[in-house]
Amino acid sequence: MTAQTPIHVYSEIGKLKKVLLHRPGKEIENLMPDYLERLLFDDIPFLEDAQKEHDAFAQALRDEGIEVLDLETLAAESLGTPEIREAFIDEYLSEANIRGRATKKAIRELLMAIEDNQELIEKTMAGVQKSELPEIPASEKGLTDLVESNYPFAIDPMPNLYFTRDPFATIGTGVSLNHMFSETRNRETLYGKYIFTHHPIYGGGKVPMVYDRNETTRIEGGDELVLSKDVLAVGISQRTDAASIEKLLVNIFKQNLGFKKVLAFEFANNRKFMHLDTVFTMVDYDKFTIHPEIEGDLRVYSVTYDNEELHIVEEKGDLAELLAANLGVEKVDLIRCGGDNLVAAGREQWNDGSNTLTIAPGVVVVYNRNTITNAILESKGLKLIKIHGSELVRGRGGPRCMSMPFEREDI
């Protein structure tokens, strides 16, 4: 990394030097059973224990010499002037789907009154309950204020924020600032916008943008994997459109970030396989985790760029051989989540047994609960750093989902 290129990520496995996390906060306590589906959760984590688990995750990374950055801190540091701060508040409000004019005015006054930038950022993440606002005089209420009185939130919380992998993705020296699948999560990308526009280290045009949050088609970071300095992998999934991938790839190739080919993986479109990294991650030079249930239906396309056009070829044959050829290794070992047992594979994939974070070649952070997959990984010679995640996993994400590398050593 240099002062000119504060982002440097050219693999999934190079020694991790710097990573972005978000410690779960009050946004988790604003989850309610009646609105879980709306907020993309299946259950409600116990915040106190989720924070302990996340703190242990962050400490495990620090113990390996990795610098841990906090999303809320970087976002707060990006609000460097009163003008930027006010612009952030206004943009946040415009995207918050606030239904009543009087309600919007009251929330703006609440946010403008928060003097500390970090406190302001944390409040925008937590959401705003209607009970926090002063009573609006009947004479000032619009029709929306009157008829939507039962829903408890004036602004929804953002409980998925601890999955920092998805709102934006670091690719080479650039960043894909994503347009996300759901309105609930798309608001999360606002923090990335301000970080990469206004932060003293990461803003000011120092980081090339290869996708824009204002695009109309959707893409998420869990579907963006950097296999090597030459090859990317992208997933066509529940959360990422093929059209978005084409836009992303044209931008990557045009900006000469160094990549020569992209492997596009098309697989089952459902919640349990929501991203490529929930079923497929790289753990060593020649080893990948994979969920066996996707192998039969998986289609892979090779994408290159020449004469200002994308050239797309559907690949046939064995996936391991395809990966080996593209990575320049003799053989690739596809390590099945849960082994060959269908029940174990389903259970451990649901608990993110395939969603590993590689912090150096052959050194992998995993949830300790996926005992069968972990034993198989260890039998293959991998060093595992096991973390507790009984509460964190309720959000349906593992160590890779909860981390966004900012700097890796080259391999």
Curated annotation (Swiss-Prot):
Pathway: Amino-acid degradation; L-arginine degradation via ADI pathway; carbamoyl phosphate from L-arginine: step 1/2. GO terms for molecular function: arginine deiminase activity. Keywords: Arginine metabolism, Cytoplasm, Hydrolase. GO terms for biological process: arginine catabolic process to ornithine; arginine deiminase pathway. The active site is at residue 401. It is found in: Cytoplasm. It catalyses: L-arginine + H2O = L-citrulline + NH4(+). Pfam families: ADI. One of its GO terms (cellular component) is cytoplasm. Its EC number is 3.5.3.6. Belongs to the arginine deiminase family. This is Arginine deiminase. It comes from Streptococcus pyogenes serotype M49 (strain NZ131).
